[in-house]
């Protein structure tokens, strides 16, 4: 029984797809356990970029099983489109498995998402308008439609009719918006269900059987800990639990079967959307990091907000997600800066604090306390070991590990597979 969970430790976009792809080489099953197509991950193989939003990164290994777990909310339209994209690129999807218990995103979820966001005005959350939140709302309200329902024509028709009648009343009476047509949705989405039914199964059985047989299973989280609905910067969060604990709920695997948790972070910080960001940069340094790091959302295309590395955030993530190993990405983006900074604590109304407040008004008043380190000018994208890094870059990597309190297992100096450097093998340490 061997399993590793990969979680983002910041606000998403940390490079989880790259690290999952890297760790997938030694895994036999790769599974997603939460989120939906609001999460984008980019994988670079032989210089070619592949951008996925729903299908696990492990799909590029045809001999390995890729699982979309029950905790994921699935937009069948997006899934069919992504499958076609992979097929056009010559990538087989015969190794994909989709949980019959996963909930379905339908057009009324997306419309409701847009209407709710518009109604918030200046208090908007910054949602990707993918229908994720409304789909999880229906799930919690016990009126959601699951993949198993989508495949049964009569059940799908009955539940869609009931749900759509309620949603249309909401659209017309509360939002003065156009109602949606039952027949159009039913025909389109039932057809999508028939296209994906070959992949649908009880994925909890597949995952547990694999673990019981001693196979290596890798769980791939979406978003990041700071977007977790319980542990993140609520309400500026996603609607699921990206923390490692979400694995057990979203995959049907017990907590006693989780061995290691790899926290993925960048050598700086970024986030898409609104919400607190204590170390955010608004100067030319921030603009430089954004441009060099190509900080634009995979899903939205929006410019990401960027800032210095925040060890307060990272220690919070380590604690609530049980992180055992750290993967530090995008060190190369900081090359060329005379000075690099790490936030070590916050100043809250004249008092130093080492924790991340839950109160958003307090967070607004938090001022980062920085430790400054000398930067490095060298191009490090070709570095293949820690010893090859310039001394100042090595010191930066070591200091990050010290402040977070977790050993760094890998560090990356670029987006390619070959640019990920191993300091300690996660699989070998189990």
Swiss-Prot record:
GTP binds at residues 12-18, 40-42, 304, 330-332, 412-414. It catalyses: IMP + L-aspartate + GTP = N(6)-(1,2-dicarboxyethyl)-AMP + GDP + phosphate + 2 H(+). Its EC number is 6.3.4.4. One of its GO terms (biological process) is IMP metabolic process. IMP binds at residues 13-16, 38-41, 128, 142, 223, 238, 302. Pathway: Purine metabolism; AMP biosynthesis via de novo pathway; AMP from IMP: step 1/2. The active site is at 13 (proton acceptor), 41 (proton donor). Keywords: Cytoplasm, GTP-binding, Ligase, Magnesium, Metal-binding, Nucleotide-binding, Purine biosynthesis. One of its GO terms (cellular component) is cytoplasm. It comes from the Bacteria. The keyword Cytoplasm applies. One of its GO terms (molecular function) is adenylosuccinate synthase activity. InterPro entries: Adenylosuccin_syn_GTP-bd, Adenylosuccin_syn_Lys_AS, Adenylosuccinate_synth_dom1, Adenylosuccinate_synth_dom2, Adenylosuccinate_synth_dom3, Adenylosuccinate_synthetase, P-loop_NTPase. It is found in: Cytoplasm. Mg(2+) binds at residues 13, 40. Substrate binds at residues 298-304. It is an enzyme of class 6 (ligase). Coiled coil: none annotated. It holds the Pfam family Adenylsucc_synt. Its cofactor is Mg(2+). Plays an important role in the de novo pathway of purine nucleotide biosynthesis. Catalyzes the first committed step in the biosynthesis of AMP from IMP. PANTHER family: ADENYLOSUCCINATE SYNTHETASE (PTHR11846:SF0). Homodimer. Belongs to the adenylosuccinate synthetase family. This is Adenylosuccinate synthetase. It comes from Streptococcus pyogenes serotype M1. The gene is purA.
């Amino acid at each position: 029984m061997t399993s590793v969970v990969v979680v983002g430790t910041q606000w998403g976009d940390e490079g989880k797809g790259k690290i999952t792809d890297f760790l997938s080489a030694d895994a036999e099953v790769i599974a997603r356990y939460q989120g939906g197509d609001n999460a984008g991950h980019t994988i670079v193989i032989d210089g070619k970029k592949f951008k996925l939003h729903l299908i696990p990164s492990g799909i590029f290994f045809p001999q390995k099983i890729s699982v979309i777990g029950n905790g994921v909310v699935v937009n069948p339209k997006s899934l069919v489109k992504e499958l076609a994209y992979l097929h056009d690129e010559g990538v087989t999807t015969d190794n994909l498995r989709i949980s019959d218990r996963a909930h379905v995103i339908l057009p009324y979820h997306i419309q409701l998402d847009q209407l709710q966001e518009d109604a918030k005005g200046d208090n908007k959350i910054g949602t990707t308008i993918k229908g994720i939140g409304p789909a999880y709302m229906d799930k919690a309200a016990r009126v959601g439609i699951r993949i198993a329902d989508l495949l049964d024509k009569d059940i799908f028709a009955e539940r869609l009719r009931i749900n759509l009648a309620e949603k249309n009343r909401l659209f017309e009476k509360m939002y003065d918006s156009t109602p949606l047509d039952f027949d159009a949705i039913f025909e389109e989405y039932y057809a999508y269900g028939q296209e994906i039914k070959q992949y649908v199964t009880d994925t909890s059985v597949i995952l547990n059987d694999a673990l019981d047989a001693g196979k290596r299973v890798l769980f791939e989280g979406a978003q990041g800990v700071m977007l977790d609905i319980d542990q993140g910067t609520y309400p500026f969060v996603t609607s699921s639990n990206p923390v490692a604990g979400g694995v057990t709920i979203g995959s049907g695997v017990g907590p006693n079967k989780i061995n290691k948790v790899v926290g993925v972070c960048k050598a700086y910080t970024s986030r898409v959307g609104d919400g607190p960001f204590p170390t955010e940069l608004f100067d030319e340094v921030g603009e430089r990091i954004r441009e060099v790091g190509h900080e634009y959302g995979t899903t939205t295309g929006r410019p990401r907000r960027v800032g210095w590395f925040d060890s307060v955030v990272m220690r919070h993530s380590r604690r609530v997600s049980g992180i055992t190993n750290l993967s530090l990405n995008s060190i190369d983006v900081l090359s060329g800066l005379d000075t690099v900074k790490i936030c070590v604590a916050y100043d809250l109304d004249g008092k130093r604090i080492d924790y991340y407040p839950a109160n958003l008004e307090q967070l607004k008043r938090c001022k980062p306390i920085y430790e400054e380190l000398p930067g490095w000018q060298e191009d490090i994208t070709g570095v293949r070991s820690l010893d090859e890094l310039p001394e100042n870059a090595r010191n930066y990597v070591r200091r990050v590990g010290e402040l977070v309190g977790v050993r760094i297992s890998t560090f990356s100096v670029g987006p390619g597979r070959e640019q990920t450097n191993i300091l300690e093998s996660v699989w070998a340490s189990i």
